[in-house]
Curated annotation (Swiss-Prot):
InterPro entries: MazG-like_dom, NTP-PPase_MazG-like_N, NTP_PyrPHydrolase_MazG. Induction: By oxidative stress. It comes from Mycolicibacterium smegmatis (strain ATCC 700084 / mc(2)155) (Mycobacterium smegmatis). The gene is mazG. Keywords: ATP-binding, Hydrolase, Magnesium, Metal-binding, Nucleotide-binding. Its cofactor is Mg(2+). The lineage of its organism: Bacteria, Bacillati, Actinomycetota, Actinomycetes, Mycobacteriales. This is Nucleoside triphosphate pyrophosphohydrolase. Disruption phenotype: Cells lacking this gene show are defective in response to oxidative stress. Complementation with mazG restores resistance to oxidative stress. Pfam families: MazG. Changing A222E: Pyrophosphohydrolase activity is reduced 30-fold. GO terms for biological process: dATP catabolic process; dGTP catabolic process; dTTP catabolic process; dUTP catabolic process; TTP catabolic process; UTP catabolic process. It comes from the Bacteria.
């Protein structure tokens, strides 16, 4: 006498050890999808007649299942769920909402931006609070945003992608960034960090930026944006004296919109950096090569080049010339 327990999420997937026993007299519990018993030649309901040699079910708490196991029936069960299997359910749920929900079906990447920002802040607060229940809930809310945006992307007329593409990109990135760790090699913290930065730099060479300001997310809070931009221009070799004080000194008062003022200053500074980088590239290119045919990477800009092409440099130089 045998009890076969299948995964309730995939009831049609039968454990391989049970296949040989399903060709004869089989009973099934009522929650099983009708297509499963229909595919078995001699299947009948659990309460129909005497006990069959095999009982097929997806419910370990079903009275008949519990009774037969208590009587000593052999159990053949589906493998235990692997970590991440509930993510499959979450993906399916998001697909149902996107296709059937009046609100979900109308959303776009842009319309969800404020929710993504709000949920990120709430997750930050949950981390700070140390409350495990809040952290679990807020992680779920952020996961919802990831699933939602990925599902919206499936409907895009140009360059669509799915949640599997998102996961694949992450797996590829991590596989490239920390191959030693994933290969099981012994590696120190410093070695791992060095490998991460080295691999990251290699990726950037393949995907060369036209500007040091490329890929800076401007939707982040103004202070975080300013810090990111300052880090970028520092890496790009911009002399410190060219950074305006409006980016490094923030005044906060009740009657000023400090967030908006700082953001405006940072965005204007980013535009200036891009303009100077373009001017440097044009100066190096010369007049004989059209801009659209110039595929050479910008490379390193020296401090002298930054100063020479920075707005106001010519007027400053003329003011500094001694009178004859």
């Amino acid at each position: 006498m045998i009890v076969v327990l299948v995964d309730p999420r995939r009831p049609a997937l039968v454990p391989v050890d049970a296949v040989e026993f399903l060709t004869g007299d089989v009973q099934y519990t009522e929650e099983m999808p009708v297509k499963v018993p229909w595919s078995l030649p001699s299947a009948r309901p659990a309460y129909d007649g005497e006990d069959a040699p095999v009982l097929l079910s997806s419910d370990p708490e079903h009275p008949v299942v519990k009774a037969r196991l208590a009587a000593g029936d052999r159990l053949i069960a589906a493998p235990e769920p692997q970590p991440g299997e509930r993510l499959v359910d979450a993906v399916a749920l998001m697909d149902k909402l996107r296709t059937s929900g009046p609100w979900e079906s109308e959303q776009t990447h842009d319309s969800l931006r404020r929710y993504l920002l709000e949920e990120t802040y709430e997750l930050f607060d949950a981390v700070r609070s140390g409350n495990a229940d809040e952290l679990r809930e807020e992680l779920g809310d952020v996961l919802l945003q990831v699933l939602f945006h990925a599902r919206i992307a499936e409907d895009a007329p140009h360059h669509p992608f799915s949640i599997d593409d998102v996961a694949d990109a992450l797996v590829r990135k991590l596989g490239n960034r920390v191959p030693a760790v994933l290969a099981g090699e012994s590696i120190s913290l410093d070695e791992q960090l060095a490998q991460w930065e080295e691999r990251k730099a290699q990726e950037k060479k393949v995907k060369a930026r036209a500007s040091s300001m490329d890929d800076v997310p401007t939707g982040q809070p103004a202070l975080a944006l300013a810090q990111k931009v300052l880090a970028r221009v520092s890496q790009a070799g911009l002399p410190a004296e060219l950074i305006p004080a409006s980016l490094t000194s923030v005044s906060v008062s009740a009657d000023t919109d400090s967030e908006n003022e700082l953001r405006t200053a940072v965005l204007e500074f980013m535009d200036t950096v891009r303009e100077v980088e373009a001017a440097v590239a044009a100066g190096r290119r010369g007049e004989d090569v059209p801009e659209e045919l110039d595929v050479a990477p910008l490379g390193v800009i020296s401090e002298d080049e930054w100063r020479a092409y920075w707005p106001g440099a010519e007027s400053s130089a003329s003011e500094a010339e001694p009178e004859e």
